[in-house]
Amino acid sequence: MAINIILLGPPGAGKGTQARRLIDERGLVQLSTGDMLREARSSGTEMGKRVAEVMDRGELVTDEIVIGLIREKLGQGGKGFIFDGFPRTLAQADALQALMAEMDQRIDAVIEMRVDDAALVSRISGRFTCGNCGEVYHDVTKPTKEPGKCDVCGSTDLRRRADDNEESLKTRLMEYYKKTSPLIGYYYVKGNLNPVDGLAEIDEVAAQVAKVMDKIPA
């Protein structure tokens, strides 16, 4: 049976880094809401046309549409899926739970990346990425070996997100805690919440995630 996990954590907690490792090491597929919407929009399918119409009107895509896209992805099979950025609310969590039951699947583990807010702001405000290959760097903890040049691909296209500044980060954290924090209690009650230390070294976080994954029944 496919393994389905949810990654929870505030912006910059390291969800993307750990998702990439799970993709590479365990063959899971990452289901990112943004990626699914962009893919659907360009697909030309009936669902894709609905997505395009909503986005072209500048409106938010409904939970019903997102669940429809997830249903399509789950129907394609595979070793399993990583839910990143969904669910964000209790209503979405309930809808996902119902979809899983309908498709005779389950959420095997919810991995919560726990972080200290002040440390998180420090971490993200120094972050930049390679626009070519996506490698992530940090001014203090992971600078490039050669200033202005990516260690991996050699590109000089190094970028900082416009909202990776202290004020914007505090706003994003407040939004996360207001909307998404209730999910922690939701999945705790269901018995599949697994906290990990999101501020540990990347390899240590990966080791904690691996322990969670290895406990999932085959």
Curated annotation (Swiss-Prot):
BP-aspect Gene Ontology terms: AMP salvage
Annotated signal sequence range: none
Enzyme class: transferase
Pathway this chain belongs to: Purine metabolism; AMP biosynthesis via salvage pathway; AMP from ADP: step 1/1
One GO CC term, this protein: cytoplasm
SUPFAM superfamilies: P-loop containing nucleoside triphosphate hydrolases
GO molecular function, one term: ATP binding
Xref: InterPro entries: Adenyl_kin_sub (IPR006259), Adenylat/UMP-CMP_kin (IPR000850), Adenylat_kinase_CS (IPR033690), Adenylate_kinase_lid-dom (IPR007862), P-loop_NTPase (IPR027417)
Binding site for ATP: 12-17, 127, 136-137, 200
Keywords of the record: ATP-binding, Cytoplasm, Kinase, Metal-binding, Nucleotide biosynthesis, Nucleotide-binding, Transferase, Zinc
Written domain comment of the UniProt record: Consists of three domains, a large central CORE domain and two small peripheral domains, NMPbind and LID, which undergo movements during catalysis. The LID domain closes over the site of phosphoryl transfer upon ATP binding. Assembling and dissambling the active center during each catalytic cycle provides an effective means to prevent ATP hydrolysis. Some bacteria have evolved a zinc-coordinating structure that stabilizes the LID domain.
Function according to Swiss-Prot or TrEMBL: Catalyzes the reversible transfer of the terminal phosphate group between ATP and AMP. Plays an important role in cellular energy homeostasis and in adenine nucleotide metabolism.
HAMAP family (alphabetical): Adenylate_kinase_Adk
Protein name: Adenylate kinase
Organism: Paracoccus denitrificans
